[in-house]
């Protein structure tokens, strides 16, 4: 007989209105059920676990106190918003999280009206929420706007730009600071709770507001004096609370810290402050992985653990057989090898040391590896400063995040010719993280930058060769892009060798058609060439290696030999590698028939990389079909 799962409270919550119909004393049970459901789904459908478990209580409290979707919640990054998705009509869809045709792992306005603003990258929530609050006030709408931002995102400069601007507006903006990493000193003891109770009480704030209004009415206080009075008030609060607070330096009212995993306390505090005028910050202390002991004890590992057994807490592993390593680990090991050779080599990462395997260098040379926080622009310019003083920085940034440091790449690295090696991790389509995390634009926006070299390795050996070349064979800025996940070689520890800049290679000679590829997608192209050979079609395959500068000598030879060329890249076709090939042909009056294969001009949703390749016509079957069509209709 099939076991029937008992009905729970969340089975009857199809919108926040259903949640608000519950009694306050039922909310702790809702939180427990949400955590249980998140664990149930994520144990077999991997996603971001730790942050989502920690955010359950304040998510429930926000939807209980505020009138969503009329009131707006703007999520920063958004991978902590799983309980938000479950509470807003996507409970059953949650079982297909991050899957092809399923729901995104991040807030997406295309998916739900409750997802008010797209999320995926860090530090933008305050600016977006402030814009919404100002627009609502301009339309005389009484809605409240809430930005939810983690302490990690507060290292991003845009967050401080938003805070600085927010102090100029009187609008009802609430910033929830989700502090789960002890990066902001906490107040302790009974005095702190007493101060929070007083400062959030309606009596205190009514008197405070009425006093200010009265003084303004009789012209005893100007706007400048109001700010001075606010600073005095904040200084008095800091004296009583024994804390100097940077947020109130922006003239933004601060409340907290408050236990962010106590839903009833949160409902109480939110009800007290929700109608207060002006921008304010509620500082919540949460536990990452709350409610699941393994995740609480090892927050980094359980941030996104993959599949796991809920009862034992054991993460599931693949078969115990030799497999290619991740490109990330090849980068990490190779960086350590180079650092062994030259003490000038250092590593820089903006808050992704584990993901990019910079931890290998940190472990062996802790004083030569720098995690600068979520601050990509700073990471690039910091690296340029290191290079200025004679060091050789390897700055590792995810491809989708280098977009946030583009000006610095141009102004602070390329313009000065700094010897900075920028390693773009997770280049190309990345799978389940979806549109916000695909690294598909870098080739298009980097190849137009003067005095910079851009390359992409076919495999792990070539990655090691390019890293050595960037260190020892070239003294200017160089970008090396490579994908997320495993490569193709089990025996990857070659002795690295210098390669010639702007030199590609022919992988397969052929006569009927030429494939030009760049990067690891060339391994798939090579399989297509082999399948064509089985059908009697002689196809050539060239691994270009360098996007900038191109191997022009090789391109001249290809143009003179072939009437039909297919370029293949794991990036956007607008302005990318294929466009560079077409520009070369046009500039030199060659007229071959060229077809570009790559990511089309649209955002690609979440799913597996093979599913995304097929959707974009970048998989082997699509490439084979395209080739046959071109050969049938010369």
From Swiss-Prot:
InterPro entries: Dxylulose-5-P_synthase, THDP-binding, Transketo_C/PFOR_II, Transketolase-like_Pyr-bd, Transketolase_BS, Transketolase_C. It catalyses: D-glyceraldehyde 3-phosphate + pyruvate + H(+) = 1-deoxy-D-xylulose 5-phosphate + CO2. Mg(2+) binds at residues 151, 180. Pathway: Metabolic intermediate biosynthesis; 1-deoxy-D-xylulose 5-phosphate biosynthesis; 1-deoxy-D-xylulose 5-phosphate from D-glyceraldehyde 3-phosphate and pyruvate: step 1/1. Its EC number is 2.2.1.7. Keywords: Isoprene biosynthesis, Magnesium, Metal-binding, Thiamine biosynthesis, Thiamine pyrophosphate, Transferase. SUPFAM superfamilies: Thiamin diphosphate-binding fold (THDP-binding), TK C-terminal domain-like. Thiamine diphosphate binds at residues 79, 120-122, 152-153, 180, 292, 376. One of its GO terms (cellular component) is cytosol. Binds 1 Mg(2+) ion per subunit. Transmembrane segments: none annotated. It comes from the Bacteria. The keyword DNA repair does not apply. Its cofactor is Mg(2+); thiamine diphosphate. Catalyzes the acyloin condensation reaction between C atoms 2 and 3 of pyruvate and glyceraldehyde 3-phosphate to yield 1-deoxy-D-xylulose-5-phosphate (DXP). Belongs to the transketolase family. DXPS subfamily. This is 1-deoxy-D-xylulose-5-phosphate synthase. It comes from Porphyromonas gingivalis (strain ATCC 33277 / DSM 20709 / CIP 103683 / JCM 12257 / NCTC 11834 / 2561). The gene is dxs.
């Amino acid at each position: 007989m099939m076991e029937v799962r008992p009905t729970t409270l969340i089975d009857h919550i199809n919108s926040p209105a259903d949640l608000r119909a519950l009694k306050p004393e039922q909310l702790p049970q809702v939180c427990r059920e949400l955590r249980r459901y998140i664990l149930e789904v994520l144990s077999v459908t991997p996603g971001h676990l730790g942050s989502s478990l920690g955010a359950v209580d304040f998510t429930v409290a926000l939807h209980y106190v505020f009138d969503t979707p009329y009131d707006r919640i703007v999520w920063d990054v958004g991978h902590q918003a799983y309980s938000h998705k479950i509470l807003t009509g996507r409970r059953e869809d949650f079982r297909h999280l991050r899957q092809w045709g399923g729901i995104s792992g991040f807030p997406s306005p295309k998916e739900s009206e409750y997802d008010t603003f797209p999320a995926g990258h860090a530090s933008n929530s305050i600016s977006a929420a402030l814009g919404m609050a100002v627009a609502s006030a301009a339309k005389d709408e009484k809605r409240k706007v809430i930005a939810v931002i983690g302490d990690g995102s507060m290292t991003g400069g845009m967050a401080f730009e938003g805070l600085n601007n927010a102090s100029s507006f009187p609008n009802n903006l609430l910033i929830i600071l989700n502090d789960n990493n002890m990066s902001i000193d906490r107040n302790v003891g009974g005095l702190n709770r007493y101060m929070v109770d007083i400062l959030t009480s309606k009596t205190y704030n009514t008197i405070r507001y009425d006093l200010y209004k009265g003084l303004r009415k009789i012209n005893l206080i100007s706007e400048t004096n109001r700010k001075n009075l606010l600073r005095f008030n904040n200084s008095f609060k800091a004296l009583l609370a024994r804390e100097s607070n940077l947020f109130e330096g922006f003239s933004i009212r601060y409340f907290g810290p408050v236990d962010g995993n106590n839903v009833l306390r949160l409902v109480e505090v939110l009800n007290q402050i929700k109608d207060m005028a002006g921008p304010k910050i509620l500082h919540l202390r949460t536990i990452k992985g709350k409610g699941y002991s393994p995740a609480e004890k090892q927050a980094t590992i359980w941030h996104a653990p993959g599949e796991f057994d809920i009862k034992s807490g054991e993460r599931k592993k693949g078969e115990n057989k030799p497999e290619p390593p991740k490109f990330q680990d090849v980068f990490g090991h190779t960086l350590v090898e180079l650092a062994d050779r030259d003490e000038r080599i250092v590593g820089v990462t903006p808050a992704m040391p584990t993901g990019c395997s910079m931890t290998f260098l940190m472990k062996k040379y802790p004083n030569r590896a720098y995690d600068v926080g979520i601050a990509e622009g700073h990471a690039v310019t910091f690296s340029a400063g290191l290079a200025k003083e004679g060091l050789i920085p390897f700055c590792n940034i995810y491809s989708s995040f280098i977009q946030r440091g583009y000006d610095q790449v141009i102004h602070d690295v390329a313009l000065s010719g700094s010897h900075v090696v920028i390693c773009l991790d997770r280049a190309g389509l990345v799978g389940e993280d979806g549109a916000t995390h695909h690294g598909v634009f870098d080739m298009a926006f980097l190849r137009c930058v003067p005095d910079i070299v851009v390359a992409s390795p076919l495999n792990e050996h070539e990655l090691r060769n390019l890293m050595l070349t960037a260190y020892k064979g070239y003294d200017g800025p160089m970008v090396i892009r490579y994908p997320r996940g495993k490569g193709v070689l089990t025996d990857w520890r070659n002795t690295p060798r210098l390669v010639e800049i702007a030199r590609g290679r022919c992988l397969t000679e052929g006569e009927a058609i030429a494939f030009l590829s760049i990067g690891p997608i060339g391994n798939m192209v090579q399989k297509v060439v082999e399948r064509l050979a089985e059908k009697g079609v002689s196809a050539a395959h060239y691994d270009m290696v360098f996007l900038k500068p191109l191997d022009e000598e090789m391109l001249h030879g290809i143009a003179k030999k072939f009437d039909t060329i297919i370029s293949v890249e794991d990036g956007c076709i607008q302005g990318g590698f294929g466009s560079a090939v077409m520009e070369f042909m046009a500039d030199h009056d060659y007229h071959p028939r060229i077809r570009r294969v790559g990511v089309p001009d649209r955002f690609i949703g979440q799913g597996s990389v093979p599913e995304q390749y097929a959707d974009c016509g970048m998989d082997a079957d699509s490439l084979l079909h395209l080739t046959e069509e071109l050969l049938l209709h010369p």
